[in-house]
Amino acid sequence: MFNLIRLELKKESFKWYGIGTVIANLLILALIIPIQYVEKIETDEMFMIMGALIRAVFIIFGAVLLSKLIIDEYKNKTIFLMYTYPIQRKKLITAKLLLIGILTFITISISSALVAVGYFIIHNMFQISPDTIPAQRLIVEIVSMLKFAIAAAGASLIPLYFGLRKQSVPATLLSSILIVTVITQSNPWFSLADNIYISLVAATIGVFIAFWTIRNVDKVDAI
């Protein structure tokens, strides 16, 4: 399985993903600092906003990966060339989905830590709000974001269903935007962005869709 994942890494160029990750992190950090300064938002809410933004960005990035590694290959029929290899179809699809889930989890985890540390340093240097952020608080917030990262990795697979059903990249991307809109919404009365149970439900749906796809890949030539 790891050999197949390594093959995918060699076959596709992920340079765009790395560059996009760096740019996204810088933009998120550049966005949250002035928001807190101008709106006088409490630190608790800022960490929630930070985590929600990071998860939203990389769930959409996950949809782009789904489009490049799976949807495009079905749409252009190039995936059927891989099915001529002496390797089970299930293993090929599993490797692709594992790669997408692992990349999404890793990038959300690293981004959460980097953006949180960046925010911590800037906040304490320039005192952009009356709140103080001790190092212990920073660690607690990062650990909390890592729990959401696991759930987001599963949720990032939900667009697979819509993309394969239509064999459409736009459907894949639009469904990912809809998903992040739902699971990261927040208002003064009720917030889904910091509700781990909602995120876990979305993750369960994503994992179920992945298993369904793997199970049915041998039965038909197009899912």
PLM feature segments, named:
Residues 1-21:
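Aromatic- and glycine-rich beta-strand/loop motifs that create alpha-glucan
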Residues 11, 34-73, 194-202, 223:
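Membrane-embedded or membrane-proximal helical elements that form or frame transporter/channel pores
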Residues 16-18, 88-89, 93-94, 168-173, ...:
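Membrane-helix interface segments
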Residues 21-28, 170-183, 199-202:
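Central hydrophobic cores of alpha-helical transmembrane segments
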Residues 23-24, 195-223:
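Alpha-helical transmembrane segments of multi-pass membrane transporters/translocases
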Residues 30-59, 98-160:
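Secretory targeting signals
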Residues 62-66, 79, 155-162, 209-213:
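Hydrophobic/aromatic residues in alpha-helical transmembrane segments
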Residues 69-101:
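Helix-loop-helix units of permease transmembrane domains in multi-pass membrane transporters
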